[in-house]
């Protein structure tokens, strides 16, 4: 039999093992895995390379439409492809208007036309003002609903995102449970974090350490505990976003052991940066929840290796450089990171700490695809879409600003020596990024709708 593409001699990350084996692709899907697979129109030799499922990044902010000067589909998805991401799940905030009903999600789809280098799924927003319109987003095909119990949104902009109070969260989660949807939550205690932050600013405490102290671990843990209880009472699946503390992970683990349907994610920056480095890097490393100390980081690595964290995500949330000006308490909180999720975590988790390749594949791709119902994504297996990434191990480079594809070429990882490289990214059988040739085909990404897979 003749195939469209055969990838030969790579160490392939399968679900429960990794071994040198060939992959045949036909019609954009994986047709066979094995040896001596036959002929193909195109053959790629992956000798010495790791062949991973393309990353499913379940937490990105592209900011288009309305804030394309922050980021945009063209720049953001090129950066994603260069970083080994083949599917992103887009958040309903940072763009204007926020994605909270049928009209606003259609604006997202229109804005993305012809610009997606990778595939994308979309989350709807659960906000204080759209409880009676959640069904519109479900009908369109979002794969989940995001909300904040921490303060968010610009109160001076009518159509910006808004946090929810406990009543709004409970009522919204009830409705989402009836739709068989998942609610995703940014978990920090709004009032305590806000007051601690204002107190620090009044007293002139504006360093990175002061910012971290204004959003202590207990504010994350309390919020996780609260939304776990409310989501359970409402009968809704829960996904806890960007957990930053081992104590927070423990709350999820305890609930899971008691039978609750709950998952959680974390981000590379909580594993590879600490508060001292945050102080050194400055506002480019500001995010919330904040980057914590080395002891906290050690605990996070233990939770990751124990299997208590389901997936790793970028929480890519860039902004114009002027919004990062001033002191740390004043600056916008958000990290530009999606281009360096895979290479940084392959280096830090696999090469430096001995994580198995199958576990790496689950954390970067498989589990997120399963959590959000992306049926054709996240695995190297017959019948799945041929979304693949070639990783060159033990190949160090220093990240430079000009390497970045973002609208604004800044990142807290600039200057970092990264010990692995993404050399090729394949989306549905086509090479969309190559380290030597850049982006060889026009954008071919498409939106994935929950009900139309």
Curated annotation (Swiss-Prot):
The Gene Ontology terms for molecular function here are: allantoinase activity; cobalt ion binding; zinc ion binding
Q: Which gene encodes it?
A: allB
Group of enzyme by EC: hydrolase
Q: Which residues carry this modification: N6-carboxylysine?
A: 146
The protein's job, in short, is: Catalyzes the conversion of allantoin (5-ureidohydantoin) to allantoic acid by hydrolytic cleavage of the five-member hydantoin ring.
The pathway this protein participates in, as annotated, is: Nitrogen metabolism; (S)-allantoin degradation; allantoate from (S)-allantoin: step 1/1
The identity of this protein, by name, is Allantoinase
Supply the Gene3D superfamilies for this chain: Metal-dependent hydrolases
